[in-house]
Amino acid sequence: MKHFNIFLVAVVLFSACKNKEQKTTVAEEQSVPDFVVAFGSCNMSQEPNPFWDDILQENPDVWIWGGDIVYADTDDVDRLRSIYAMQDTVAGYNKLRNEVPIIGTWDDHDFGVNDGGSDFAIKAESQQVFLDFMRVPQDSERRSQEGVYASHDYEVPEGKIKVIVLDTRYFRSDLIEDEDSNKRYKPTMDSTATVLGEVQWKWLENELNGSDADFNLIMSSIQVLSGEHGFETWGNFPLEVEKLEQTITQSGAKGVIILSGDRHISEFSRAEVHGLSYPLVDFTSSGLTHSYFSFSGEPNKHRVGEVVSDKSYGIINLNIKDKEAEFKIMGDNGEVLQELKQSY
């Protein structure tokens, strides 16, 4: 019996060592990303956000607000400022802000009016409140320009990442209501209609043309590739979609990825663009505190996988050496709700 016990102990120790070796091998095979981006949109400051601790666990290099940071819907500047201040009191967000760089853009509800565009009366004042919340210095050029668009450059030992943040509100032309179907809006072929406005378009072209980054992420608060649902989307301005695709292609910029929000759903869209050597991905992540839980389907010819209608946030792991991006729709407690890998 004594000999049997010695044999059993030996087997257990051998198995433990073998398992340890296997785990080490698996861990070694898992590549550590060179740069981690976390982003999300549609956040009500008065509602619980379960994700701030999870986001920190991902150890992101940057957090990008995709718009609707707060739900203000007001032309009262003091009220707008007070609602932003409420978000600043959220403990989990404060911890994130103290540990991770935070950048981003606005959408309609933090801009100040649902589905709002260029005709919003206090857009200039709203811009300053937004920049205050984002802690943009008073002497920044962004304080004197029209619109909240900006670019941010990051460098790691393996390479460079550029994040281009667009403003799809300040200059956007009027939407056309669709009275002939159950959709809210319909596309316009008016060549003067715009999403970005002349100055921002020129700026975007310069940013992409002059970029030597290994990955170029474009944050658009509204979806770019999903354009059939009839809500807000670049698809309501098809000539602008064509212009964006041509701008990306002609620039020669590497690894262009589109991020978007707004819709209270999360999904991956992917399209082959003529002249572009890699597929264009639009990663929609929305929303953080509330979602389209009654979602029952909508067309999107570019969709990859399924729509996630649960609350979620987005993670992009960038591997510069392998020229690969891993996109993950994340739920609470580190749950991966859906993922997509793309080579560039």
Where are these regions (language model features)?
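Metal-dependent phosphoester/phosphodiester hydrolase catalytic core
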Residues: 18-344
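Sec-dependent signal peptide recognition
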Residues: 2-9
